[in-house]
Structures are given as C-alpha cells and as structure tokens.
Amino acid sequence: MQTVGREARAASRTLAAASTDAKNSALVAMAQAIRDSRDALLAANAADLAEARAAGLDEALIDRLTLSAKGVEGMAAGLEQVAALPDPVGEITDVKRRPSGIQVGKMRVPLGVVGIIYEARPNVTADAAALCLKSGNAAILRGGKEALRSNQAIASCVRTGLAAAGLPQTAVQVLETTDRAAVGALITMPEFVDVIVPRGGKGLIERISSEARVPVIKHLDGNCHVYVDDHADPAKVLPIVENAKTQRYGTCNTTESLLVARAVAPRFLSDIGRMLAARNVEMRACPEALALLREAGIEGARLSPATEQDWHEEYLAPIIAIRVVAGLDEAIAHINTYSSGHTEAILTEHYTHAMRFLREVDSASVMVNASTRFADGFEYGLGAEIGISTDKIHARGPVGLEGLTSQKWIVFGNGEIRR
C-alpha cells in the first residue's frame, strides 16, 4: 500500500498541473473504451452476480451490483458529461483590493489524493475516476469483493483512457486485493491520502469514520422522508410517493418514512395504501394511520403497527413507516428528530409552508413537490457524484467536482509592504 500511495501522490502533482484538454481527452477515451468493452463488462458482471447469488447475498446488494447494457451506456455518458462540465481547477474568485494596495482572492485547487472505499456498485469505479480526474485529483479505489471482476474490467477501460491522453495510469488505481487489511492501510496514510470517501453499508462507514487518520466525506444512512402537507396538490401526491418509495428500494435516496397531515390523511392514505399494497410494500403505521389504512381494506402481512425503531430505520427494502402528524410543525420536528440528514421532501402548494420546510429541515437536500429520488449528482447537474455527504463541513449533499476541490488564498501585490 505504501507503493500505491507514493505513486498516487506523484500522479496527483501531475494531474494538478494537467490542462483541461488533457483531462477531457482522457475522459472521452475512457467513455469510448467502456462502449467498446460492453460485452466484456457485462460478462464480468454476470460472473460477479452468479457468485453473489450463490453466496446468498441479499437482493438490495444484488440490485446495487447489477450492470445492464443501459447501465454501461450510462457510465460512458456520465464520463462524457463530466468532460463537458467546466473545469473548477484554477478558478479565481472574490478578488478584492485592500486599503494596503494588495489584491486578495481565492483560487480553487485539487484536494490531492482521494481514497474511495465502496461495496457493490461497479459504476462507482467509473464515476469516481471521472470526478477525481476532472478535479485534478489522483484516486485510489477499493471496491467490494462481490464486484471484483466488474471493477477490474472497468479499471482496464480507465487505464486505456489515461494512456490515450498521455496521463499517468497511476492517476487512478483500483486495488485488486480483497484483503480487508488494505482498507485499514488506506485510511491511515495521511502522508499519501488527503481524504477518504466511503460508500457502502452503515457498518463499513462507521468503521472508517472511527479508524481513519484522514478526513472522511460520508453519510451513514438514508432515512429520507416525504411529508404530505394539508395544502398538497392531489394530482402530485400519489405519483411522487410511488416514485420516491418504489422506483428502487436499495438506494440511499429512497423514501423510508411518510408523514401525512391530519387534515388530509383520510383523503390521501387510502389511495397511497392501496398503491403500496399493490406493489407488495409493507406498511408500518402509527395508530391513527393504521386505522385509516384498515378502513381502506388493507390487512394482513402488509400492515403492522410501527415501533419507535421504525422511525429511525433505513430499510433498503419494500417497507415504509407511515405517521399522521398534526401539521407542518410536527412534521419538521419529527424529521429533525429521526432523519439521517440525507433528503426530505414536502408536497404542498402553500408558499409559506414550503419556505419554512426548506429553512427549518436540517438535511443535506430539501425538496418541494419532487421525489427524494432526485437527490443524486447526475440529476443535480454534477455529471456524476463521488458520494453524498450529510456532514456540514467542507461538502454537503451530492459531492461532485467542486466538492473535490479546496480553495487557497492568493495575493497580488505591486511592491507593497506591511506597515
């Protein structure tokens, strides 16, 4: 690992000085290599999936592991989109002339070497390579053993792109070992690694956060909420709740808790409950919601009383917690008590309610009349994301190019001395 770190540090200095054209050329070449290697990528992924199923891994993990032809094209398109984004490196802002005569400003610069530790998402290999490269950072990637073949195949495409642009292939290194000791080494090399981005289960992220000797950009889980306000538009409620909960169960921006204002709960919960039941979603409801759902004819295994733990839970499964609240005040209080700080949405046509929700809900992404599934770097126009942060220092929410840079102070003088 010392050799890997040393090579990454050397490559980071080359990348920090690399031109935008060189970085973009590498990204475009990576995208073409991925398209040219589609069959090989899908074959590698199929082998990973077969092994994962044979090992009895859960469906949420298998969902994250799966690559399709559409997914391969999405990776290539993501690389090209990052190439098309403005290069943040070298950007100078906030230049002001001081009374002394000097001009003081800020310049955006790369972080240096970024270590990314992730589990079952092979697309992270391409996304991380793209964002680190464009932002002038070297990357050390350590994927999960369940995606080893997929990650190796994608890494080959990344190296092809770097070589085509004349950039060091050590700028993006994918660790091919499945030894857990590699993670311990990666997160304790501050002389070579400037920041760690873990993407995976809560246990992995908690371990890295407690053991790392370098800064960590992270979120522990995604207990996302949708609140149906008493001024919600009926035409928007069902489609948004359906999308937010049922589009994909294994993602951190999937809604796990539904709050409904008491004044409109009888109106909306029957239709919402029937929709969720038709999609085999288990509902864990407060007593008031439980009664309304039973009145709508929902019984059996799909409906049960919620416990205190349910309000904290990131299910990553076809399960949702449902609570009737008095109104906006109780909804905000509930979210700020139980949320993981990831993403929350209010469905309302009331401007004041919407603005209060945006101001007072303490999460990385807060939405009005939109699905929580939009909390994603690609959807936010970042091209791709290195991860999502629920911390408040440095980067918050989806972390794209700008989140992988820092700023340094720059001073322009003309012979001034301090008096």
Curated annotation (Swiss-Prot):
Protein name (database record): Gamma-glutamyl phosphate reductase
Keyword Cell cycle among UniProt keywords: no
Domain of life: Bacteria
CDD domains reported in the protein's UniProt record: ALDH_F18-19_ProA-GPR (cd07079)
Pathway where this protein functions: Amino-acid biosynthesis; L-proline biosynthesis; L-glutamate 5-semialdehyde from L-glutamate: step 2/2
Sequence similarity: Belongs to the gamma-glutamyl phosphate reductase family.
Gene, per the UniProt record: proA
GO annotation, biological process: L-proline biosynthetic process
Signal sequence segment: none
PROSITE patterns (alphabetical): PROA
Catalytic activity: L-glutamate 5-semialdehyde + phosphate + NADP(+) = L-glutamyl 5-phosphate + NADPH + H(+)
InterPro entries, alphabetized: Ald_DH/histidinol_DH (IPR016161), Ald_DH_C (IPR016163), Ald_DH_N (IPR016162), Aldehyde_DH_dom (IPR015590), G-glutamylP_reductase_CS (IPR020593), Glu-5-SA_DH (IPR012134), GPR_dom (IPR000965)
Localization: Cytoplasm
EC code: 1.2.1.41
Protein species of origin: Azoarcus sp. (strain BH72)
Function: Catalyzes the NADPH-dependent reduction of L-glutamate 5-phosphate into L-glutamate 5-semialdehyde and phosphate. The product spontaneously undergoes cyclization to form 1-pyrroline-5-carboxylate.
GO cellular component, one term: cytoplasm
A GO molecular-function descriptor: NADP binding
Keywords: Amino-acid biosynthesis, Cytoplasm, NADP, Oxidoreductase, Proline biosynthesis
Main location: cytoplasm
